[in-house]
Amino acid sequence: MSLAQKINRVVAPFEVISPYQPSGDQPKAIAELAERVEAGEKDVVLMGATGTGKSATTAWLVERLQRPTLVMVQNKTLAAQLANEFRELLPNNAVEYFVSYYDYYQPEAYVPQTDTFIEKDSSINEEVERLRHSATNALLTRRDVIVVATVSCIYGLGTPEEYIEQMVTLRRGAEMDRDVLLRRFVQMQYVRNDVDFHRGTFRVRGDTVEIIPMYEELAVRIEFFGDEIESIQTLHPLTGQVVREEEEMYIFPASHYVAGDERMGRAITTIEDELRERLQELESQDKLLEAQRLRMRTTYDLEMMQQMGYCNGIENYSRHIDGRPAGSAPHCLLDYFPDDFLLVVDESHVTIPQIGAMYEGDMSRKRTLVEHGFRLPSAMDNRPLKWDEFLERIGQTVYLSATPGAYELGQADGYVEQIIRPTGLVDPQVVVKPTEGQIDDLLEQIRVRTAKDERVLVTTLTKRMAEDLTDYLLEAGVKVEYLHSDVDTLRRVELLRELRKGTFDVLVGINLLREGLDLPEVSLVAILDADKEGFLRSTTSLIQTIGRAARNVSGEVHMYAGNVTDSMRRAIEETERRRAVQIAYNEEHGIDPQPLRKRIADITDQLAREDADTADFLKGMGGVKSGFDFGMGHRGLSSLDRAPATGEGAAAPAVDPASLPAKDLADLIEQMSQQMHQAAADLQFELAARLRDEVGELKKELRQMKREQ
């Protein structure tokens, strides 16, 4: 079955909307990347220095190529930041976010040494789950899609064919029995709930059926006249206000692992066959305990599947449900993309090794479970893709990195370089200093920087050294904080914001290579024990660390070392080469490097400013609360989801601000501001961003009301 035959894809052009035009090295890089891709080169590398605008270059490249794009990123937080950047640059296109939906995940495991079985335990983030469904929905219904994803995209997912087969197509004026539609919704794993109406449920009131698809925040109302669909409306689930009328709509299943009755029946039969074979094998080896354990667990799962259509851990039976042969690769997000999609690997020197490492780590745990009777052997086929399977599923690939790895450089025919920064900022000067008296020298340099209201990053090799250095600097009267692995993700971002604000002046850490540490206020990066060869002091790591000072006009890097290693020499030579290129460009074009004023690449910095603005604003309005409870709950009134393909912007607000009294509107602003902070605390950066935007619109409306009074 062709996906195109089943669904009418919306075709709209990618269009970058930005007040800026490509500058510096960007025009040359965009043109050369596009030429290489259009010429059919399979692998292309963009070596882009820190601060040269690689994300914007990617957006302009996608606009030129007009192809669905998957952008792979190394972790969730960076994926959220990059998705926000793309949404700003491509507001009329579908920019999706696909990462693991677990806030907490403890996979099931068995420790033979202590005879300890650890049950699977997890906490699912509902908003991230919605965004995952939104990504697959967008890929199947339109062409102008960019999905920003972590390596979660190579883990097993239901087949797109079955996902589409279970889909319901609604058309105004079409003949459809209401009860048949309700049964279809149940088969798609939606739950009827006439009281608590939320995402993944539907309710029925006479000839009116309402459902909130898993990938939407708004509800869909289907009104029948006999067996004819009289109208299809998108509406706000709380207020009931109609947002728009629909002529046609697709409702996709509530789970990526949904299967029809026929497919589930076949799966149950093949699971029973495998169980019999495995029990015979275990009993022939006198593993009676393992055989009994496997019989009990699998029989229970089979009963659940027969009665309910699913069971806990149903993904472990995905090979049977998909009808795949033993040892075959699982379906994953890559299978939802059209054949001509473009893959962009961000920070490829980190992301590529991640992809290759996923399979073995997962397999060693599952192998133990199978050997001791906790799972059937087919559970090992619920896994991430192997490296060669990943390569089979991708087409043309663009690798982005300031320090591309050996693999990328080996695959590509040379590389495209992007060194020149539009701002004119030059790579920092690198100074090598002796280790003798390094702490006293560092303390003196810190005092020089703090006197100028500048910030300092210090990177050490060990946790103990970082802790001791932090204590020493505190005793010396330096305002310092220590960034370590025990600090959770949101607190890390808060530390960066506090560093920028001047709450403290020095940040000490071990691995300060993360992209979130691009801080314009940092004028000095100190690298202790720079001559200790290893992962943290390799050429790649040193260049990445040097880049942390590349956002400041007077940036410097001090390497404390007893001798200059090969890694140090290569890193220094590359930095000097890039400095020379930028300086020559500045002189030729008469550019005077300007200090960079850049927000932290995350939503929390905006939230802090928004919070202060909202507090002042409401205070100015008299701080009167009406007591009106909008009852928005966790989801809020956010309607700024993916912009429609028509390019007309976001959906109309679900609540018309003009219809509310000023006091109620002020109360709504305060409630939504609280939800904005809660969303950020839950790492739901996309939801927080949408709430932030809506708060801004509501404040404009309230200011207008105030002027008219």
From Swiss-Prot:
InterPro entries: Helicase/UvrB_N, Helicase_ATP-bd, Helicase_C-like, P-loop_NTPase, UVR_dom, UVR_dom_sf, UvrB, UvrB_inter. Residues 438-604 form the Helicase C-terminal domain. One of its GO terms (molecular function) is ATP hydrolysis activity. CDD domains: DEXHc_UvrB, SF2_C_UvrB. It holds the Pfam family Helicase_C. The keyword Phosphoprotein does not apply. Its main location: cytoplasm. Residues 666-701 form the UVR domain. One of its GO terms (biological process) is nucleotide-excision repair. This is UvrABC system protein B. It comes from Micrococcus luteus (strain ATCC 4698 / DSM 20030 / JCM 1464 / CCM 169 / CCUG 5858 / IAM 1056 / NBRC 3333 / NCIMB 9278 / NCTC 2665 / VKM Ac-2230) (Micrococcus lysodeikticus).
